[in-house]
Amino acid sequence: MKPALILASESPRRKQLLSEAGFSFDVVPVKVSEIPNKNLNVNDQILDIARRKASAALPLLKSSRQDAFIVLCADTEVIFNGAPLGKPADRQDAYRILKLLSGKYHEVITAVCLVESSTGKEVSQTETTKIYFRQLTDDEIWTYIDTGEPMDKAGAYGIQGQGGKFIERFDGPFYNVVGLPIDLVKNLLSKF
């Protein structure tokens, strides 16, 4: 019998993507510090946060479940000039981030970490998508900020929402930018 899949995330987008891909899973939200370890390179910083989520979820789940399970955790960051931008702290920060991205390339990196409860086996990997924003006007930026959409998203935009209109082109998986590269998840799950 295959172990149950547990999404350890508060992200409604990750839950939706897994559902739409046909996965059967439970959701257990976990909170961990998402402050990156600056001693690591950017890719490893993002992997480290996904692993911290798995480490926080495992003991919680083991105490409440008798069956074997695989915990799925992810972290997504928008990277500009080699540095993570994070989620905006406030409206002014959202403006700063969107102005920075306007007319330029950036990357979206998602780290996916899966851990099997009975063996402790972990598989993890990152996925990268390159994004090019068209030139944005101040009016467009403030109108978008007024929608509230950018406030809970890395890089201050959602490709699947109104923020998608700012993207001129992208190279890499679309769902990676939404927050969960489904093909990578399928590939990693096949290793169990």
Swiss-Prot record:
Catalytic activity: dTTP + H2O = dTMP + diphosphate + H(+); UTP + H2O = UMP + diphosphate + H(+)
SS bonds (residue pairs): none
Enzyme nomenclature, EC number: 3.6.1.9
Domain of life (superkingdom): Bacteria
Function recorded in the entry: Nucleoside triphosphate pyrophosphatase that hydrolyzes dTTP and UTP. May have a dual role in cell division arrest and in preventing the incorporation of modified nucleotides into cellular nucleic acids.
Family classification: Belongs to the Maf family. YhdE subfamily.
Protein's UniProt name: dTTP/UTP pyrophosphatase
Organism listed in the record: Bdellovibrio bacteriovorus (strain ATCC 15356 / DSM 50701 / NCIMB 9529 / HD100)
Lineage: Bacteria, Pseudomonadati, Bdellovibrionota, Bdellovibrionia, Bdellovibrionales
